[in-house]
Amino acid sequence: MTPLKIGACLAPHEIADHRDWLFDASRDLELQGFSLHHDLTTEFEDRIAAAKSALDGFNGRIGMHGPYEGLDMDNKDPELRPLITARFLKALEAAERVGARQMVLHSPFTRWYAWNRLNKPSYWEEKLARIHDVMTPVVKAAETAGVTLVIENIFDVDPATRRAMVDSFESDAIALSIDTGHAHLARRMSGAPPVDYFARDAGNQLRHVHLQDLDGHADRHWAPGEGEIHWAEVFRALAECTSEPHLVLELRRKSDIPQGFAYLKGLGLVE
């Protein structure tokens, strides 16, 4: 199996600490710091400027994490849905301006949905209609901007559900993201399949992966090797994917990036 090149998720002010590792090999880089209200309002221009400065001379692939807290794309209140759309569109503007080719958004699917989807007539159809109400303008804007929206699993139990949602837009501007830790936590909490199954189910809709480890109790965002995930099988599944997803370490302690990279490199999985 050929080792895969990986990068990391960092806020602009954190990039300098990992500059040589990221820049010399043109690794994948996901910008963080564009998800909160003040990031996209009062501090918007300052954050754009800081990101552009930190990225000067960078030739790798750039992504950005979009907003998520309180912004469920399946909001049942029709007066609130346009506000969520507007917030996503503002984040998309930031992604375009900093040169990102991807923007991460969170999945609206939960354990409750997985266990109740056949318990209510038209549950899937009604949920999907609300999602389209919020997301159709964002997907169309992403098409124009040349940015791919990648939908990250959070509480997802059945990866096929999120894939069906993405497929329903019939657009290259929306695809799938996997967070390895979230997938493993869903396995522990909700009986979801293992992480490699999430990757294999996504197939060539997979465009982005958050690499993080955990103990199955909480969303730890530990360095690979510190938790329970079976990394060899995860990377076997990723190696089968021909869509060349962005692969980024998303760690709670950015100082652990070298440790996580060294662990995976020692297994012969990354370069």
Q: Residue locations for each model-derived region?
A:
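Active-site acidic/histidine proton-transfer and metal-coordination neighborhood
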Residues: 74-175
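A cross-domain feature marking catalytic cores of carbohydrate-active enzymes
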Residues: 8-12, 31-33, 64-68, 105-107, ...
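Alpha-helix-loop-beta-strand connector modules within alpha/beta enzyme cores
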Residues: 50-69, 128-144, 231-237
